[in-house]
Amino acid sequence: MRDSVGSVRSVLLLGGRSEIGLAIVERLVREGAREVVLAARGGVDPVPGALTALGADVYSVDFDASLPETHTGTVAEAVALVGDLDVVVDAFGVLGEQSAYEADPAAAARAAAVNYGGHVSAGLAVAARLREQGHGALVVLSSVAGVRVRRFNYVYGSAKAGLDGFAQGLADSLHGSGARVLVVRPGYVPTRMSAHVAPAPFPATPGQVAEAVSAGLRSRATTVWAPRVLQPLFTGMRLVPRSLWRRLGR
C-alpha cells in the first residue's frame, strides 16, 4: 500500500512479460515501489533480475487473458500477496498480422477477445478492488491504432478503439471514488511483439512510454501520448476525409 507520503509501494502488472509493461514497472520501482506482482500465463519464472536488484520484492501469479472468469481471482491473489494495489498496469495483448486474420476469421475473433474482452473483465475486476480501497490507479495501454482505425491493421486497431472507449468510460465511473484510470496511447514501439511490423514515424522506446506514464501518474493526467507529438498529429488525422484516409499507408 501507499506509504505515509503517498508514494507508490505496490504494482500489479497484467501481462507480466510485456516489454512496455516491465519498463513501466521498473520505472516505478526506481521511484520507490517495493512490491511487484507479475501476472502472466503460467506465471513469470524467473522474475526479472533488474527488479530484484533494485530492491523490490517480486511475486508471480498465473493470468490468462483469454479466461475472463479467472480475472477476479487473479486480482484477489495479488491482493493476498501485497495488500492494497497502488498501481495496476494493464499491458497484455496480441498483435498478429492483418493478412493472417483475414485468412483465419476465428483467429481474428480470438485476438479481439483478448485485446478487448480480456481488458473489459480484467479492468472491471481491478476497478472493483480500487473502488473498495478508495485509492489506486489503473494504467491502460491503449494505442494510437485505436484513435482512427487504418486498413492495414483494422482487427487490432478496432479492438484498441474499443479498449480506449472502455477505459474512458471506466475512468468516469470511478470519478469521486479515489481511484482513477490513466489511458496511454503509444505509437510504434519496437518490441518482440512488433518485430514483424515495419517501423512507423515518431517511434517510442519502452523506456519513453514508461517515462510518460510516470509523469502522467504524478500529474494525475487522464491520458498520455508517447511521444507527445502524436496528440496533435492524430487530432488532425481525425479530420482527413475517408476517401483519402483509406489510401494512406503507415
Task: Label each region the model flagged.
Residues G123, A159:
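Active-site helix of classical SDR
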Residues L51-E69:
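Rossmann-fold cofactor-recognition segment
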Residues S143:
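Residue(s) in the substrate-gating loop at a strand-loop-helix junction
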Residues R17-S18:
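Conserved glycine-rich cofactor-binding loop
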Residues V183, A198-T235:
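C-terminal helical subdomain
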Residues V29-G49:
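Conserved glycine-rich Rossmann-like NAD(P)H-binding loop of the short-chain dehydrogenase/reductase
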Residues T72, G93-A109, F152:
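Conserved mid-core segment of classical short-chain dehydrogenase/reductases
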